[in-house]
Amino acid sequence: MARYRHSRSRSRSRYRRRRRRRSRYRSRRRRYRGRRRRRSRRGRRRGYSRRRYSRRRRRRY
């Protein structure tokens, strides 16, 4: 039973890593919604900085 259990956990971790690379932006959005109350300063700074800077750069150039 121990060997079967270990092999199963390894396969799951590999699948999760592959899935995270594809849906990285979506997973981050959901995390910020849930962690807004706990980390309000960090979450707001990161979200606003990335969105605003991207819009400004596109308009300038």
Swiss-Prot record:
Name the keywords, alphabetized: Chromosome, Developmental protein, Differentiation, DNA condensation, DNA-binding, Nucleosome core, Nucleus, Spermatogenesis
Gene Ontology terms, MF aspect: DNA binding
Region described as Disordered? 1-61
Protein's cellular compartments: Nucleus; Chromosome
Swiss-Prot/TrEMBL GO biological process terms: chromosome condensation; sperm DNA condensation
Q: Its GO CC terms?
A: nucleosome; nucleus
Write down the superkingdom of origin. Answer: Eukaryota
User: Into which family does the record put it?
Assistant: Belongs to the protamine P1 family.
Functionally, this protein is described as follows: Protamines substitute for histones in the chromatin of sperm during the haploid phase of spermatogenesis. They compact sperm DNA into a highly condensed, stable and inactive complex.
Q: What is this protein called?
A: Sperm protamine P1
Originating species: Dendrolagus goodfellowi
Gene responsible for this protein = PRM1
